[in-house]
Each structure stands twice: as structure tokens, then as C-alpha cells.
Amino acid sequence: MKRKYLSLGLALVMALTLCACGGGAVNGTSTGKEDGKLASGTWQQQETGDTDLLSYSAQDLTGPIPEDWTLPSDFKTGDKVRVEVSGDKILYGDIVDGGYLNGFTVAQYADGNLTTVYEFKKGVVRSWQQFFSPDGSKLAVAWAPSTDSTEWSVTLVDLTTSGESTLKLPDMTFTYTQTDEETGESKEVTEAPTFLLLKWQNDKNLVVTASLAEYDSSKQPQTWVYTLP
């Protein structure tokens, strides 16, 4: 029998994402405009899939918010609000049951005021993912239409223009042979990834890893690097 693996990182991801919540969905909108300017880059599959899935999770889901910021009195904070800060920009959204966001807002901070730069409500976003590029000028968002969907999309956002680019993903499905332990019969199975994980390598390169909930030597995670144009 093939040995199956479930890494610590993947266990964390499962704890935060898997939810029998009736397949909640959002309204499929955002304030950005699809201009596709970041969609003409190139994909390169890596020889070995990344199994360090914890490295794709943000270390602090609540900020940290700079100590010298004075946020508006109605700004919510706490364990149920996802916050990420980059320079003078702050991303925030309510974390709902199952550890996901039904959209989020990006605002610019100045003198105690927040000015909305961008809002995302296209689909379900996992609260633990990292969003801002290192220089804070772009966002990367992995999302699905609902909590129980594996129809993944990746959207890049240029925060200087609010222009969106939905990337054309390479084939990230998993095809493997499954054997029935009782009958011994084998069949070929094709599955979409359970998880699609993102992290910025630098301002020009985005690392994308697709993984099943359980994997062995025949269905290791797939890792790709997307180089922006």
C-alpha cells in the first residue's frame, strides 16, 4: 500500500478551510476593472512540488497595525477580522465560519482616515493567504466561487490603477491510478486540486502550489512560478 502524507502545513490549511457550511458564495463583484495588464506573463513548473505548505500562510492574521496609526472608531479589530498592512495600505475583511473571507477591502491610511482603494467580492478567499507583493503595489488573490468549490481562479490587482488581471492557469489537475482494496480493481482518476496556495517570491514572481488533501508519491503537490510581464 502506498504511504499517504498529510503535512503539518496542510493540516493547518484544512483546519482553516474545510467547512460543511452549505457552500456559501458571494456576489461575484469587485471595484476593479479587468484590464489584463498583468496576465501576459509566463508560467514555469518546478521539478519538485513544494510540500512546505505552512510557508504559504501569513504569520499574523491581524496585522500588525502600526502603533502610530489612529484608525476610525468604527474600524473592527480582533480574531474575526483579517488584516494585512503594507506601507500606507491596509487590507481587511471579516473572517466567517470555516476560516474564509466573503470579500475584503483595501484602503489607504492618512492622518487617521481610510480611503478605499479596492474592494474584492468575486468569490471565497481563504483568510490565511498572503496578499500584498513585497513592495505593496500589487495583490495576489486565490479564490473560488464557494466554500465547497475547487474551481480555482487567481487574480492579480495593480493597486496603483485598481486594474485586475485574471490569470490563465496551467493544467493543475492530478491524474493517478486508484485501486479498490476489496476488489483489487484499478481505475484512472483525475482530480482538481483541493487547495491552491500563493506566495510572492519577489515583486516579479508569484509561487503557486496546487495540492490534494492527501498525497503520496504518485500525486505530489505541483508548484509553478508565474513571472509577471
Question: Which sequence ranges carry the predicted segments?
Answer:
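Positively charged n-region of N-terminal signal peptides that target proteins for export
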Residues: M1-Y5
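C-terminal motif of bacterial Sec signal peptides marking the signal peptidase cleavage site
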Residues: T17-A20
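Bacterial signal peptide processing site
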Residues: G22-G24
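Beta-strand-rich domains and repeat architectures in extracellular enzymes and scaffolds
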Residues: D35-L53, P66-I95
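Beta-strand C-termini and the immediately following turn/loop, strongest in propeller blades
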Residues: W43-G49, S86, L91-G99, V141-T147, ...
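Surface-exposed loop/turn elements that mediate protein-protein interactions on large endomembrane-trafficking
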Residues: Q45-S73, G103-E119, T155-F174, P221-P229
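Signature of short aromatic-glycine-proline-rich micro-motifs recurring in repeat-based ectodomains
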Residues: K76-V81, Q129, T183-K199
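Blade-terminus and WD-like Trp-Asp/Gly-His loop motifs, strongest in beta-propeller folds
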Residues: R82-D88, Q130-K138, L198-L206
